[in-house]
Design a protein with these regions (language model features):
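Sec-dependent N-terminal signal peptides
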Residues: 4-13
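A structural "domain/chain start" motif
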Residues: 16-72, 164-167
Length: 167
């Protein structure tokens, strides 16, 4: 019986370790907002220890618009998580009237496609960073939509975090 409880504790700790964590700032400013504009910035992304991200891209055939396609998976999963909170993630456009923007910034991708990511929340009027969220995602290295699986997982993890923090 004791082994069973240790196993359950291990599973719970693994699940909690993989989720998104607010590491700086607060999301209190988001309360009352209807949406947040989201963009993907891969400019800081490195492959393995310090190789250019392009080496990862060159491992398989990729769609030309893989960033845009990857974000579609993020929006779907994030919005499924936050639907009951009446809050949604939307693409960055000039028509977006929301006050805040989230920039998803992948930092490091390993050989199998797993990614370490920061998501930064900015006040669009002042350009002030109000929060930093950190998480890791599983992935693969040969998907035509390069970050499809990581963006699905990011959508779920960040959506779940926002849902909890918006209560």
């Amino acid at each position: 019986m004791r082994k069973f409880f240790l196993f359950i504790a291990f599973i719970v700790s693994v699940v909690n370790a993989s989720g998104a964590k607010l590491v700086e700032g607060s999301l209190d400013c988001i309360k009352g907002e209807k949406n947040i504009a989201v963009s993907l910035d891969c400019s800081k992304l490195v492959y393995k220890k310090n190789r250019p991200f392009q080496e990862f891209l060159d491992k398989a055939s990729r769609m030309e618009n893989w960033e845009e396609e990857s974000l579609k998976y993020f929006f779907k999963k994030f919005n499924e998580e936050t639907f009951k909170s009446h809050f949604s993630a939307v693409p960055v456009t000039s028509r977006n009237k929301g006050k805040y923007e989230m920039v998803i910034t992948p930092l490091k991708i390993n050989g199998g496609g797993d990614i370490k990511v920061h998501a930064y929340i900015f006040n669009k009027e002042t350009n002030e960073k109000v929060a930093t969220i950190e998480f890791k995602t599983d992935g693969d290295d040969n998907d035509e939509i390069t970050l499809r699986d990581p963006m699905k997982e990011a959508g779920e993890d960040l959506g779940s975090l926002f849902k909890k923090l918006l209560k």
